[in-house]
Amino acid sequence: MTTLYLVAAFIIGACISLQAPINNQLAQAFGQNTILAALFSFLVGTAFLLVVAVAGGNIPTALAALPSQPLWKLCGGFLGAAFIIGSIYLVPKIGLASLLALVICGQLISSLMLDHFGLVGLVERKLTPVKLVGAIVIMAGVVFMLFGDRLLNALRSS
């Protein structure tokens, strides 16, 4: 893995952290309308992607392949919408850090399984004991982050 790819992944993560509270503020401006905020978020993203796609060219050739694709390949937009709607709704309920910690745990567990079995067209990358220990350490960190204060207070009061 090159350093540039690692830095890009870090920046993407920072952008995801900004996305949820920005979309939540938009929902508040729309009278707590989570769906409308998600819709506008996607409209802005769609407009941006349209400009990039047109600038890149080759759209007719790429679209010609669309009818032959299985339906599951079109689920990315649905999953993205579910993530955006869920994020907008959950940020004020559980907080941004808790939301993203749990999102990361969900992504980590599912990505380890997807990699291990080579699902949805991924190259098979077996789950090794080292990867498993790393995932457990990350998940333990999330548990401490979410419940550590309560655990400490319970230990102190006993």
Tell where the protein language model's regions lie, with residue ranges.
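Membrane-interface interhelical linkers
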Residues: 1-11, 25-28, 35, 46-72, ...
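Residue-level signature of transmembrane alpha-helical cores of multipass secondary-active transporters
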Residues: 8-10, 72-73, 100, 135, ...
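Hydrophobic/aromatic residues within the transmembrane alpha-helices of Major Facilitator Superfamily
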Residues: 14-18, 47, 78, 82, ...
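Structural motif at transmembrane-helix junctions in multi-pass transporters
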Residues: 32-33, 86-102
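Membrane-interface alpha-helices at helix entry/exit sites of multi-pass transporters
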Residues: 33-40
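Hydrophobic/aromatic residues within transmembrane alpha-helices
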Residues: 37, 90, 117-119
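C-terminal transmembrane-helix exit sites in multi-pass transporters
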Residues: 109-129
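Hydrophobic transmembrane alpha-helices of multi-pass small-molecule transport proteins
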Residues: 127-147
